[in-house]
Amino acid sequence: MSRLTTFAALAAAAVSLSACAVTNDLAKVPEPMGRFLLGHSVTVVEEPEIGPFSREATDEAWEEAINFAMEERFGRYDGDKYFHIATKVDGYALAMIGIPVVFTPKSVLVASVTLWDDEKGEPINEPEIFTVSEELSPEALIGTGLTKTADEQMLSLARSLAKSVQKYMLE
């Protein structure tokens, strides 16, 4: 993904909350996905684009947040065929403290995701690029830079990503 494309995606997502994914559905029975059983969730963070006005985050923190969110969502499935989810963080912006109503930066994550068939040992799709923003919440309206830590923002973005990946898989 080119730097220009990454920043364009970051900018587009940062100005709109309409793309927020509500992920509070984890207490419900998951929609069936055939024989799906989560094998591994692997996350790679190699020199991601960091958007303007972003808090810093370590690669390890991103890996932990995304793997947790993927396992939280996909670990509920009990099929009999293993699949792996490989995620590459392409870019992000973690909202900094802003001025409510006047300037409320939004957090955004751009990631490429590939699904792998364990039995065949090969990917079942070309990398799918996802651009997600934080879960819709009252805090998001005033700016999560004021109300959440960077770790909380990353977990929210990771959960939105996992929800978007699930939606993609169900299509």
PLM features per residue range, with description:
Residues E71-G75, L94, A162, Q166-L170:
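Sec-exported extracytoplasmic/periplasmic mature domains
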Residues A21-G34, L146-E171:
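Terminal low-complexity, intrinsically disordered regions
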Residues R76-I124, E135-T147:
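Surface-exposed short loop/turn segments
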